[in-house]
Amino acid sequence: MSTHTETPVDGSAETITGAQPYEAGFTESSAGRVYTVTGGDWEQVLGVGEDDGERITVNMGPQHPSTHGVLRLVLEIEGETVTETRLVIGYLHTGIEKSCEYRTWTQAVTFLTRADYLSPLYNEAAYCLSVEKLLGITGEVPERATVIRVLVMELQRIASHLVWLATGGMELGATTGMIFGFREREKILDLLETITGLRMNHAYIRPGGLAQDIPDEVIPEIRAFLDYMPKRIREYHALLTGQPIWKARMVDVNFLDAAACLALGTTGPVLRAAGLPWDLRKTMPYCGYETYEFDVPTALEGDSYARYLVRIEEMGESLKIIEQCLDRLRPGPVMVADKKIAWPSQLAIGSDGMGNSLEYIRKIMGTSMEALIHHFKLVTEGFRVPAGQVYTQIESPRGELGYHVVSDGGTRPFRVHVRDPSFVNLQAVPALTEGGQVADVIVGVASVDPVLGGVDR
């Protein structure tokens, strides 16, 4: 009958009969001993752990609810301290970039809008701006189309930050913040559905302009939202900004200064929370952003709490831009005049809301054979883009979203590469989490706000 020794709290030893032996190779350390977390024996526990150099490797994800998707974190921990963080990605790879090579320039939009599924309009905008540069029609895009692009992008910036607020609040136990965030996001999704026909994956921004004009009836709804949302932002401040538990979990946690951000290539709120006012809408304007009045919120602390404050303030600045967009809306076309590119500019909105105008269908089917042939070839074959390559970057809710688009002169993209900000910003997670507590890993990932659809593509 095998025995082993258990050391009670009072330090005396007694022999326990009937105990099963441990696996071969175990050392006489803390195995089989009973300890308390207070008292004289706790120092002995710490000493044993240090002498043996024991580390535990744990997996956080890819099914963990706090990883914002199918992200796997391999953590090496000593006690409650994270000594090493390794990221494993690729679980959500769908081959979006490669699929674009087998579709026309316009059809590729329907793939790319599914990359970062929380801000699909930004993928559409960055891609279409790239194609327009290759076509040499950047200056020909109608002003109304450009204003509407800015309008819908800023609406989606607020919606994306609201998801970050809701999911981050849920992960830290602030369930009221989760309810508030999704409540306001639902109102924005209703507006985007009225404008584009879909709540997400819109395929609304097209090379040369937009798929369709903005409905007149949505303008009063947007203005009502502009009156409603500032009150809700003040509500978030009242609920969370000064909340002791919220601050205790975020202040001086997951610190990353400006130098580290630049070394790692991080952009967006993570970089601005470290004190650098880098916003492509200001530094490298596109879509006429240089004509809009808004500020770039920054903070100096570089911790998770600073990133929270930056995103909250950005929602207020987006409201300013949206209001200016509504004031600038003037009647006019929303697609370039070149009929060799402007698909589907002639497909006005029909009763089904999906662009099947019976009036235009009757025209091309019954009165103009040439129009029918042109429409058929434009839809099935697509337009040709001159050979060349271009890189376009815009400021998405998560940072710099870049598109490198290459054309060989054909009707399909030769190569489309996405520089997704979530992919780059995730490289900062080890720097944010190593040396901290296990519980702070969740805060660190949430403060980066990654979307795995854009990371894996």
UniProtKB/Swiss-Prot annotation:
EC number from the UniProt entry: 7.1.1.-
InterPro entries from the UniProt entry: NADH_Q_OxRdtase_suD, NDH1_su_D/H, NiFe-Hase_large
Localization, UniProt: Cell membrane
Keywords assigned: Cell membrane, Membrane, NAD, Quinone, Translocase, Transport
Pfam families, sorted: Complex1_49kDa
Coiled coil location: none
Any GO CC annotation of this UniProt entry: plasma membrane
Membrane topology type: Peripheral membrane protein
Catalytic activities: a quinone + NADH + 5 H(+)(in) = a quinol + NAD(+) + 4 H(+)(out)
Molecular function via GO: NAD binding; NADH:ubiquinone reductase (non-electrogenic) activity; quinone binding
Gene3D superfamilies noted in UniProt: Cytochrome-c3 Hydrogenase, chain B
Top enzyme class: translocase
Annotated family: Belongs to the complex I 49 kDa subunit family.
Primary role: NDH-1 shuttles electrons from NADH, via FMN and iron-sulfur (Fe-S) centers, to quinones in the respiratory chain. The immediate electron acceptor for the enzyme in this species is believed to be a menaquinone. Couples the redox reaction to proton translocation (for every two electrons transferred, four hydrogen ions are translocated across the cytoplasmic membrane), and thus conserves the redox energy in a proton gradient.
Subunit details: NDH-1 is composed of 14 different subunits. Subunits NuoB, C, D, E, F, and G constitute the peripheral sector of the complex.
Name listed for the protein in its UniProt record: NADH-quinone oxidoreductase subunit D
Biological source species: Parafrankia sp. (strain EAN1pec)
